[in-house]
């Protein structure tokens, strides 16, 4: 084989100057790669012109300009999952599948989360995920001969924040190991991890009923954390037409933490809640900034079952389901695997320890391979890395600087701001923490307007729920509209700012709505206009209301009374129900209120006042 010029190889691998999409093309199938005992990284004729190389490619006959657009494997799977979900039948028996009579489910979870760092774990290359493929790659990332790992000290800080948030004991001395396996996304043939001596052990996290755990778990359940370890991420694989995969090595060496729980989860819904709360917690302490939706957090679940009739029996043989990419997938995959194991055991079979896969939208798991063990991975201490020594003063400093934890914030949102647990959880989990900061900013601006001229102040519980409702539900409508909108996407920054709907603009809109100066319908129309860029600031909202005479000119008392009298005409049958029923028929009253709204000028009617006047009219006629 001809030697590739060193200069061209270096330019290709380290500066991202490659054809089209900038990824290393692999046209050898997985099975073929295993037969060869290696993974193909570079074609032997890499130094030839692009057209010459593709002229004799085995699996691809088109030139790069003729190839279909690159689709990341994760996006491809999600698109397929959406289609499967549309075709799947809905299970209306909510909560009925958390237990199976006569059987106990046991689940342990391994979470892999990308740390919020500027550098990779053992090289100075940047950890940017939005730049051109293979543009942030160091020599060590590709395992070039002679390259050595050098621990980037700053990567330890977010890892410590995560471990302390999980109530772990930080180990003063930890060490790095090599976990050997061969695949094309790991150039070195091994992953550097901390299998034997991790930097954190013996943590715990408590899940509460407000988090959404299974009713069978009661008011709360505490899950033990066995250990937290640092390790490297692998390359990103992009599937191409035919049996071809492209590799983006920007992700190789990105620092991860692996969080390993004890096998103390016994209900699928609680396991899913655990993953969701873990994602929220890691984001809250600024340890990780991307979640499952962007591939920044992945979950593996270990599932086993045993009969409840024998309390002394050991745990059953476990199987592992890899790379679950959504919270819902965690619950569904556990249910499917639990049911499969129970069916197998009840039929007289046995459970094999193996790794299984799961496809979103399906009802069953599938076998991938036999379960690897400690011997298979040939763990060994990494001879190129010394022990990691963590001083007590560093741990104390980080412990004091750890941010407000979600459980405390949830209590404050409920007790101080008057939000429901569901709304509080949603605000904390959306936009990687940006949505809750946006909420605080809007409430502050909203409250300032309301309290001007108010003696003694105004309880925040009087207006914060309105802000939360709009920030969650009306914003949800705007996000749905973005699916067909090619303009700037709807985004909220980590510090709670939104370019499409500025804080001051929403606060001004909500102020007019709360003061009943505009109707809810008008407020929604103004929000849509703001979202589409037709309104730029708070002054323009007020100006738009003035210009189009959108102010709420409510009916007078006499007009409400006349409208109520008109609405009850010809409704003798409905009115008789008010006389005959022992319980006040609220539904019939709202029917009459709806008739009022249809008969009158909707833009001048306050529904709550309409109900009040209609109730008075009905009582007058009884």
Curated annotation (Swiss-Prot):
Entry keyword Transit peptide: yes
GO cellular component: glutamyl-tRNA(Gln) amidotransferase complex; mitochondrion
UniProt key word Nucleotide-binding: yes
UniProt protein name: Glutamyl-tRNA(Gln) amidotransferase subunit B, mitochondrial
Protein family: Belongs to the GatB/GatE family. GatB subfamily.
InterPro entries with a match to the protein in the record: Asn/Gln-tRNA_amidoTrfase_suB/E, Asn/Gln-tRNA_Trfase_suB/E_cat, Asn/Gln_amidotransferase, Asn/Gln_tRNA_amidoTrase-B-like, GatB, Gln-tRNA_amidoTrfase_suB_CS, Gln_synth/guanido_kin_cat_dom
HAMAP family reported in the protein's UniProt record: GatB
Biological processes annotated in GO: glutaminyl-tRNAGln biosynthesis via transamidation; mitochondrial translation
Catalytic activity: L-glutamyl-tRNA(Gln) + L-glutamine + ATP + H2O = L-glutaminyl-tRNA(Gln) + L-glutamate + ADP + phosphate + H(+)
E.C. no: 6.3.5.-
Major site of localization recorded for this protein: mitochondrion
Transit peptide: 1-54
Bias-annotated ranges (Low complexity): 57-67
UniProt xrefs under PROSITE patterns: GATB (PS01234)
Span list, region Disordered: 30-67
Subunit structure and binding partners: Subunit of the heterotrimeric GatCAB amidotransferase (AdT) complex, composed of A, B and C subunits.
SUPFAM superfamilies: GatB/YqeY motif (SSF89095), Glutamine synthetase/guanido kinase (SSF55931)
GO molecular function, one term: ATP binding
Pfam families per UniProt: GatB_N, GatB_Yqey
SMART domains named among the record's database cross-references: GatB_Yqey (SM00845)
Disulfide bonds: none
Protein's cellular compartments: Mitochondrion
Protein's organism: Verticillium alfalfae (strain VaMs.102 / ATCC MYA-4576 / FGSC 10136) (Verticillium wilt of alfalfa)
Keywords: ATP-binding, Ligase, Mitochondrion, Nucleotide-binding, Protein biosynthesis, Transit peptide
Job of this protein: Allows the formation of correctly charged Gln-tRNA(Gln) through the transamidation of misacylated Glu-tRNA(Gln) in the mitochondria. The reaction takes place in the presence of glutamine and ATP through an activated gamma-phospho-Glu-tRNA(Gln).
């Amino acid at each position: 084989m001809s030697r590739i010029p060193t200069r061209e190889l270096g330019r290709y691998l380290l500066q991202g100057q490659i054809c089209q999409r900038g990824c290393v093309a692999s046209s050898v199938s997985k099975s073929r790669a295993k037969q060869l005992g290696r993974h193909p990284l570079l074609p032997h004729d890499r130094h030839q012109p692009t057209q010459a190389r593709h002229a004799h490619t085995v699996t691809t006959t088109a030139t790069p300009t003729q190839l279909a657009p690159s689709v990341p494997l994760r996006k491809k799977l999600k698109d397929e999952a959406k289609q499967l979900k549309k075709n799947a039948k809905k299970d209306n028996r909510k909560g009925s599948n958390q237990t199976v009579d006569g059987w106990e489910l046991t689940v342990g979870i391994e979470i892999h989360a990308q740390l919020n760092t500027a550098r990779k774990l053992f090289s100075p290359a940047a950890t940017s995920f939005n730049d051109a493929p293979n543009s942030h790659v160091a020599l060590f990332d590709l395992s070039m001969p002679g390259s050595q790992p050098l621990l980037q000290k700053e990567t330890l800080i977010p890892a410590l924040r995560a471990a302390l948030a999980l109530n772990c004991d930080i180990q003063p001395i930890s060490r790095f190991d090599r976990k050997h396996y061969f695949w094309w996304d790991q150039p070195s043939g091994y992953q550097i991890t901390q299998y034997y001596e991790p930097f954190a052990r013996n943590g715990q996290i408590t899940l509460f009923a407000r988090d959404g755990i299974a009713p069978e778990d009661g008011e709360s359940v505490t899950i033990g954390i066995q250990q937290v370890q640092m390790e490297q991420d692998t390359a990103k694989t992009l599937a191409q037409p035919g049996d071809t995969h492209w590799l983006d090595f920007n992700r190789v060496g990105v620092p991860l933490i692996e969080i390993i729980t004890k096998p103390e989860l016994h209900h699928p819904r609680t396991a899913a809640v655990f993953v969701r709360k873990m994602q929220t917690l890691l984001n809250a302490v600024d340890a990780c900034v991307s979640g499952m939706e962007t591939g920044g957090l992945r979950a593996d679940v270990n599932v086993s079952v045993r009969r409840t009739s024998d309390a002394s029996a050991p745990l059953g043989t476990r199987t592992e389901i890899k790379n679950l990419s959504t919270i819902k997938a965690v619950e569904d995959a556990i249910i499917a695997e639990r049911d499969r194991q129970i069916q197998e055991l009840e039929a007289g079979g046995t459970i094999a320890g193996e790794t299984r896969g799961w496809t979103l939208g399906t009802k069953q798991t599938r076998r991938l391979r036999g379960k690897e063990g400690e011997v298979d991975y040939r763990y060994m201490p990494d001879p190129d890395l010394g022990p990691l020594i963590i001083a007590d003063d560093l741990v104390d400093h980080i412990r004091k600087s750890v941010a407000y934890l979600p459980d405390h914030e949830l209590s404050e949102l409920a007790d101080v701001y008057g939000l429901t647990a569901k709304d509080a959880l949603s605000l904390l989990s959306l936009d990687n923490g940006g949505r809750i900061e946006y909420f605080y900013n809007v409430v502050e601006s909203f409250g300032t307007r309301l309290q001007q001229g108010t003696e003694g102040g105004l309880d925040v519980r009087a207006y914060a729920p309105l802000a939360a409702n709009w920030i969650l539900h009306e914003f949800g409508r705007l996000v749905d509209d973005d699916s067909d909108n090619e303009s700037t996407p709807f985004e909220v920054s980590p510090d709670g700012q939104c370019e499409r709907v500025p804080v001051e603009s929403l606060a001004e809109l909500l102020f007019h709505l709360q003061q009943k100066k505009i109707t809810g319908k008008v407020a929604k129309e103004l929000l849509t206009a703001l979202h589409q860029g037709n309104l730029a600031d708070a002054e323009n909202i007020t100006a738009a209301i003035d210009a189009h005479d959108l102010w709420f000119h409510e009916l007078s008392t006499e007009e409400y009374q006349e409208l109520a009298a008109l609405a009850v005409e010809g409704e003798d049958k409905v009115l008789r129900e008010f006389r005959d029923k022992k319980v006040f028929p609220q539904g019939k009253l709202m029917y009459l209120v709806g008739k009022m709204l249809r008969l009158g000028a909707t833009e001048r009617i306050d529904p709550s006042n309409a109900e009040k006047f209609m109730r008075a009219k009905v009582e007058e006629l009884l």
